[in-house]
């Protein structure tokens, strides 16, 4: 076999002419070209294995570089740093999540802002790189906590096995704290946690956890419900001011507190004063802040109090929703003339009743003492309602009864035919004691009789 010197076509050694270009060949060309071709083929055969080996080595180097770029401790660190630097909350959430702790992108976004403001990207990148290098050179599996400029832990770095049997696998864990509330009223909170709706019921004046969070400055949109209504706002908590395992939540809702001042109440019984807000009655106090109430609804407020057993109502006022602020006040006035007129009338009646009772107890005292000294129940029986408890008691214990001396009526009230009175008298030791009596008045004759004593 030879090669045409003109076109390079392979030609059978027995041919004198190139079948391709028609060039004529002589025996000299055939003799020269054949050895050259054989030598070239031998060289090519020797080169091919070395070329394959070189290719495999280059390929392995490329694969190693690629694997190292994604799996070495330094590469793992760069992935986290770049994710935070590029505000890739989804990537950060994935890197910080574990089987026992899921972190969503919203929480990761707050965490990124926290690192930027409390650590700074340059310090963060420098600290985490130095920490990983320290751990990578050490055989210890002890974790290292990264701290903010204020000294608060924000990231725990540790070794967790290996990757591809070559590289240390780095573990990045954000520390957590419980966000806690302590409401003054029984409260139901609704908000999103981990992308899902969450409901927490908190009892009044008891510490309750809303959930566990990684470092950040949070403002969580929420709704809450109390006995006074429904509110919209935010649950705010800041890890810069957290304690060892908890961080307190500050509530920021559309709330309206209300203080109430009353005029014309001087003649009313102090303990009977009440305010009525949105149909709910509460004990009155001039220093109390009532509520909170939603700023989205009108607030209606009134007041009531008693004098001589009668209930008096103050004027009613309504504060429109558009006028409600965080702190609101309402001044309500009673009709003091109506109250004073009623008191005068009742006092006149009471004085008349007290006079009537004073005469009754004066006669009763004299008659009872006579009945005791004579052991004659019939003398006093007309002062006692037949078969009443006091009737039976005196009848059965007349001989053991003590003298009833110097009775004085302190107070008296009448409702229908029933009279209640408080009487002070001297006991056998010469000391005053007070007894409450119940009497019945005959509606036809006006006569009164004792029914019970306490």
Curated annotation (Swiss-Prot):
Compartments it resides in: Cell membrane
Organism: Staphylococcus haemolyticus (strain JCSC1435)
Any one GO molecular-function label of the UniProt entry: zinc ion binding
Main location: membrane
A cellular component annotation (GO) from this entry: plasma membrane
Signal sequence range: none
Extracellular side: 68-454
Name assigned to this protein: Membrane-associated protein TcaA
One Gene Ontology term from the biological process aspect of the record: response to antibiotic
InterPro entries listed in its UniProt record: Mem_prot_TcaA, TcaA_2nd, TcaA_4th
Membrane topology: Single-pass membrane protein
Keyword Transmembrane: yes
Chain's gene name: tcaA
Zinc finger (C4-type): 4-21
Ranges annotated as spanning the membrane: 47-67
Keyword annotations from UniProtKB, A to Z: Antibiotic resistance, Cell membrane, Membrane, Metal-binding, Transmembrane, Transmembrane helix, Zinc, Zinc-finger
Residues exposed to the Cytoplasmic side: 1-46
Task of the protein: Plays a major role in decreasing resistance to glycopeptide antibiotics.
Database matches in Pfam families: TcaA_2nd, TcaA_3rd_4th, TcaA_5th
Family of this protein: Belongs to the TcaA family.
């Amino acid at each position: 076999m030879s090669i045409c010197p003109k076109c390079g076509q392979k030609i059978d050694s027995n041919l004198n002419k190139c079948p391709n270009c028609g060039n004529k060949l002589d025996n000299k060309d055939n003799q020269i070209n054949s050895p050259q071709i054989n030598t070239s083929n031998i060289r090519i055969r020797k080169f091919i294995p070395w070329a394959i080996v070189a290719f495999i080595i280059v390929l392995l180097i490329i694969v190693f570089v690629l694997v190292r770029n994604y799996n070495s401790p330094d590469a793992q660190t760069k992935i986290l740093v770049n994710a935070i630097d590029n505000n890739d909350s989804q990537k950060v959430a994935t890197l910080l999540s574990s089987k026992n702790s899921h972190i969503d992108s919203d929480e990761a976004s707050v965490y990124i802002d926290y690192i930027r403001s409390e650590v700074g990207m340059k310090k963060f990148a420098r600290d985490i790189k130095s920490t990983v290098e320290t751990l990578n050179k050490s055989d210890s599996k002890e974790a290292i906590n990264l701290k903010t400029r204020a000294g608060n832990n924000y990231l725990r770095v540790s070794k967790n096995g290996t990757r591809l049997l070559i590289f240390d696998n780095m573990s990045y864990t954000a520390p957590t704290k419980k966000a806690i509330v302590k409401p003054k009223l029984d409260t139901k909170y609704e908000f999103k946690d981990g992308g899902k709706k969450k409901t927490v019921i908190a009892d009044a004046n008891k510490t309750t956890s809303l959930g566990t969070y990684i470092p950040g400055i949070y403002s969580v949109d929420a709704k809450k419900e109390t006995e006074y209504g429904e509110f919209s706002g935010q649950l705010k908590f800041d890890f810069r001011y957290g304690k060892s395992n908890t961080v307190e939540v500050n509530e920021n809702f559309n709330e309206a507190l209300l203080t109430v001042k009353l005029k014309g109440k001087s003649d009313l019984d102090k303990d009977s004063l009440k305010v009525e807000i949105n149909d709910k009655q509460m004990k009155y106090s001039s220093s109390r802040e009532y509520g909170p109430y939603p700023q989205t609804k009108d607030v209606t407020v009134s007041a009531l109090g008693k004098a001589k057993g009668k209930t008096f109502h103050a004027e009613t006022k309504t504060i429109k929703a558009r006028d409600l602020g965080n702190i609101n006040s309402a001044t309500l006035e009673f009709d003091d003339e109506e109250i004073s007129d009623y008191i005068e009338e009742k006092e006149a009646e009471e004085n008349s009743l007290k006079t009537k009772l004073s005469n009754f107890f004066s006669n009763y005292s004299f008659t009872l003492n006579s009945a005791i000294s004579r052991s004659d129940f019939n003398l006093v029986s007309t002062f006692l309602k037949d078969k009443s408890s006091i009737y039976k008691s005196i009848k059965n214990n007349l001989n053991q009864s003590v003298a009833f001396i110097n009775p004085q009526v302190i107070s008296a009230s009448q409702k229908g035919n029933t009279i209640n009175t408080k009487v002070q008298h001297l006991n056998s030791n010469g000391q005053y004691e007070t007894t409450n009596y119940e009497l019945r008045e005959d509606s036809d004759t006006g006569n009164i009789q004792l029914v019970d004593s306490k």
